[in-house]
């Protein structure tokens, strides 16, 4: 893989955790810093080894939260497996640092990270979860199909439109993440109204 020019790898950062981390299916990580102001620590997750187990993951999410992954297509698999892998890393690191001694918050951004939020919520409910959306997936689809989103917002039902526009899986995941998150946020008043109508939870 082509190296990221903004990532500076380190063999000493978090080395004690990395040395003992037992991640599933031979999952690999790289640890370093982003080469930006503040130089934050970052863990890059290689999630390719989890692809053969995606149906097991989707079955768990259906049984626990009713997330319907059967009609999924496009970028759904990649997003879900990445976010699950990231949640597994959070879980591993939390246990290593004995996270119960701290107030830990895990922030998940957009539907693409929703499955990670749901995994953390199930395995480590003591971690506070924050879910942010910049626009709902079904709202984007409504507008992208040439339908007037905001002019008739009050008349739309998110679940119904997801069926009509073949967005069931993404909408199902996003709606579940929004409802299960300890704190649900968005970026504007108009998007908050969109969330209230289409996801049936008003942002906090």
Label the model's feature ranges:
Residues 1-204:
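Catalytic cores of nucleotide-sugar-dependent glycosyltransferases that transfer UDP/GDP/TDP-activated
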């Amino acid at each position: 893989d082509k190296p990221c020019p903004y990532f500076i790898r380190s063999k000493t950062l978090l080395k004690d955790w990395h040395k003992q981390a037992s991640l599933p299916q031979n999952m690999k990580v790289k640890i370093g810093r982003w080469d930006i102001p503040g130089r934050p620590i970052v863990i890059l997750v290689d999630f390719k080894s989890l692809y053969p187990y995606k149906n097991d993951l989707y079955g768990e999410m259906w049984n626990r939260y009713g997330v319907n992954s059967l009609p999924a297509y496009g970028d759904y698999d990649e997003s879900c497996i990445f976010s699950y892998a990231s949640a597994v890393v959070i879980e591993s690191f939390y246990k290593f640092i004995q996270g119960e001694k701290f107030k830990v918050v895990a922030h998940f951004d957009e539907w693409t990270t929703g499955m990670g939020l749901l995994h953390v919520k199930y395995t480590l409910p003591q971690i506070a979860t924050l879910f942010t959306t910049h626009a709902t997936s079904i709202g984007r689809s409504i507008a992208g199909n040439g339908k007037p989103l905001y002019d008739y917002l009050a008349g739309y039902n998110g679940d119904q439109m997801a069926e009509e526009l073949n967005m069931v899986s993404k909408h199902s995941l996003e709606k579940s993440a929004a409802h299960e998150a300890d704190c649900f946020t968005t970026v504007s008043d108009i998007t908050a109204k969109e969330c209230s109508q289409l996801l049936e939870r008003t942002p906090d």
